[in-house]
């Protein structure tokens, strides 16, 4: 399945619009991981812990998006938008949502 942020796919023609699809992922962060990440951030290093969690959440959201598109008989998802939000008590949770339009292309 083709998943793209663009509204069209070069070399393909959209023959049917199946509807809007979305996928979400909410991950909680471990207290010790957070403490370590904050220390790394304070000394100017990149937080590999947060980067891994962010990538994992993004992968989950896109996988759910693809599954929902397949359920509708789509062969692609266009116009994909990824949104990120830190939430929860003490900002201890990360939410990633992906949405787009499921389509059939030829």
Swiss-Prot record:
It comes from the Bacteria. It holds the Pfam family YbjQ_1. This is UPF0145 protein GSU2791. InterPro entries: UPF0145_dom_sf, UPF0145_YbjQ-like. It comes from Geobacter sulfurreducens (strain ATCC 51573 / DSM 12127 / PCA). HAMAP family: UPF0145. The lineage of its organism: Bacteria, Pseudomonadati, Thermodesulfobacteriota, Desulfuromonadia, Geobacterales. PANTHER family: UPF0145 PROTEIN YBJQ. Belongs to the UPF0145 family.
């Amino acid at each position: 399945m083709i998943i793209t942020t663009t509204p069209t796919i070069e070399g393909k023609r959209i023959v049917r619009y199946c509807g809007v699809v979305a996928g979400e992922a909410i991950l909680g962060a471990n207290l010790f991981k957070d403490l370590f990440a904050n220390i790394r951030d304070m000394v100017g290093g990149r937080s590999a812990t947060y980067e891994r969690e962010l990538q994992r959440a993004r992968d989950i959201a896109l996988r759910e998006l693809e599954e929902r598109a397949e359920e509708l008989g789509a062969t692609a998802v266009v116009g994909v938008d990824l949104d990120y939000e830190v939430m929860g008590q003490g900002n201890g949770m990360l939410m990633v949502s992906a949405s787009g339009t499921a389509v059939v292309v030829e």
